[in-house]
Amino acid sequence: MNKFSVKLLDNRTVLNEILTGHWLISHSGLLQLGHFFKTVTQNNASESKETDRSESLLSFYDDNYNRIAPRSVSEIPEGSIAQINCVGPMMKYGNWWMLGANEVIAQLDFVNNLQNVAAIVIYIDGPGGAVSAISPFIDFAKRKKKPVVAICDASLSLHRWIPDAIADVQMADNDISARFGSIGVVSSWMDATKYYEEMGVKVHEVYPEESSHKNEIWRAIQEDEEKGKQMLRDMHLSPMAQKFQAAVKTAHPNLLEEEGVLTGRTFGAEEAVRLNMINRVGSMKEAMQVAKALAEAYNLTRNN
């Protein structure tokens, strides 16, 4: 009923995004990429395979907040709440090692179009992920038909931008481990030049006159590392960071722009509430109650 299959990406595609992509991710999340890199390179499976992760992503609750297990769409009672999980580092496309934005969006679209689902609660707990993963959520917000409440533990970097893009209300699920912020962008890569030189391998690159700007940042880094990095900041990282900051300010018009709020610092739940970064601290049941109230208000407005 609520199942969907997704063709997971092969090793080459995952490695390409890890090694060449830009990231909306916390420092701890960035360190996790080393583990994923090791896992991917040691795994000999290169064939794309079909899998189903819908059961771990999507649950349904009736209007009394009791979890239900409908076997078909017709068994979903009117006024139900859909609960979707968005947990762990994220790329744009799902793979064996990371959740994909495409998987979460597939479930959001599914419940967004179910008549008997009144509202959506999305549980967010992650350090961030690839910059490319945010666009599908921004696009979903344009076709959203129902209220969305985000309840979060770690809501950092990409996982901070996601609720800002799609949620009507944002909550922390605790005031102990919950963290918010890390609003910023980072580019990370590994330079294996010296390693290859010690192996006696020399890499040559030849460009025609018609490709004078091809790989210009990488070429500049090789010639003058700081100059090349400044080009990367100016041409790629700063524009992304500015869009991230603008999205945060749009989602939170009363945000207190204290030191670090928009430049990468992280905050606990109570501080996030004080800064108007989130609305409140509460439980999953309370998030569902808020979602139900929003749905009722939405229906009144629509009927009038």
Tell where the protein language model's regions lie, with residue ranges:
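Small-residue-centered hinge/linker elements
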Residues: 1-146, 160-251, 294, 301
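Acidic, His- and aromatic-enriched active-site or binding-groove loops in soluble protein domains
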Residues: 153
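Assembly/oligomerization interface modules of large self-assembling protein complexes
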Residues: 142, 156-158, 228-304
